[in-house]
Amino acid sequence: MKKILVIGDLIADYYLWGKSERLSPEAPVPVLEVKKESKNLGGAANVANNLISLKAKVFLCGVVGDDLEGKHFISALKAREIDTSGILTDKTRCTTLKTRIIAQNQQIVRVDKEIKDPLNADLRKKLLDFFTEKIQEIDGVILSDYNKGVLDFELTQKMITLANQHHKLILCDPKGKDYSKYSHASLITPNRAELEHALHLKLDSHANLSKALQILKETYQIAMPLVTLSEQGIAFLEKGELVNCPTIAKEVYDVTGAGDTVIASLTLSLLESMSLKDACEFANAAAAVVVGKMGSALASLEEIALILNQTHPKILPLEKLLETLEHHQQKIVFTNGCFDLLHKGHASYLQKAKALGDILVVGLNSDNSIKRLKGNKRPIVSEKDRAFLLASLSCVDYVVVFEEDAPIKLIQALKPDILVKGADYLNKEVIGSEFAKETHLMEFEEGYSTSAIIEKIKRTHND
């Protein structure tokens, strides 16, 4: 179980749910007939709550007011088994409270009660002391900045410096214009509007997105800069090139807290040694779960697995693939096949193909295509499952299913730098080679084939 230290602004989320069917006689405003009330953990506490849902151990550090809301807040945290030993009480401020009025599942107004003044020197010192005490025993740090006074410039920089000195991953969810506050963090997660506001740069093109992320990396020394783009997913840099990790299509009911879910799931994914690309895919799946619920919702590992099993961000229709790769300057490698009963020979072949370039696109024969080519008893594994298995390989960047017997239209549209086929195509015409800059024939690993596996299963069954 990973241990995560979360520091930031603590917010109590209060919801009034009901229906509104008339206007007030006192003013032209709707009247809400309250049917239900609920309280949620918000801000940095929602990040902590998301981490708990993902099976992490969480230490939460922040400030509440000396009031009833603060006491209820601490009790709610303890009920979720979140360590509250780093939470301080400030008698000069109220606990930040956001009240949302929901009518017919639509938010109609929000009322904020808060004090955003910076913390006094004594409280800042106590927070830093707690951070210093815990830094050696935890695996990673999240700074959840809602601009409510906890994370000022000096405290933020001291915490980032300490985390780096102890070689701890530190991620920041930023607010405000001055991103020098987050200099030298491992990763920051601004959304499009926040990054535009901070850099005074309109992120309306791939070129400007790339420029913005380069600024974060070079000017602010952010090791892994990225930007969340709502329905367009997450964009980040890989070897200096812009990469977009597409979102998982799902009906959106409420985006409240989605950013907290993203940074929580990114942190745990990276601590589990996932690549940034795979971590973003996991975070997109987690976000897809929570936006399908009302309020500051949570995503469980089981729900995320269900989303990923339903689809996979690497599995794209041709039109979406072309849109994704439109501005890539990296070398694209393409190969295709049935990949029925995925085995070591397939994996070895795909790893070698990926090594020839930067992005590996795999064209996958559909079920109908395989039946025409190999008979009605094939495929053994459905196209949905075959596509998911291929997409799960780290060497595969994208999978495209095609219905034709041969992927000529796919290759013509993609125009790969390198077209890879098996060495059994020696002295044969390689379909689509005229649309690729280079054709490479590759040996298969001996002793592995789907047909041989099927025959072995038959023999074993007959015995």
Curated annotation (Swiss-Prot):
It is an enzyme of class 2 (transferase). It catalyses: D-glycero-beta-D-manno-heptose 7-phosphate + ATP = D-glycero-beta-D-manno-heptose 1,7-bisphosphate + ADP + H(+); D-glycero-beta-D-manno-heptose 1-phosphate + ATP + H(+) = ADP-D-glycero-beta-D-manno-heptose + diphosphate. Its EC number is 2.7.1.167, 2.7.7.70. Keywords: ATP-binding, Carbohydrate metabolism, Kinase, Multifunctional enzyme, Nucleotide-binding, Nucleotidyltransferase, Transferase. Residues 1-315 are annotated as: Ribokinase. The active site is at residue 260. One of its GO terms (biological process) is ADP-L-glycero-beta-D-manno-heptose biosynthetic process. GO terms for cellular component: cytosol. HAMAP family: HldE (MF_01603). Catalyzes the ADP transfer from ATP to D-glycero-beta-D-manno-heptose 1-phosphate, yielding ADP-D-glycero-beta-D-manno-heptose. Homodimer. In the N-terminal section; belongs to the carbohydrate kinase PfkB family. In the C-terminal section; belongs to the cytidylyltransferase family. This is Bifunctional protein HldE. It comes from Helicobacter pylori (strain HPAG1).
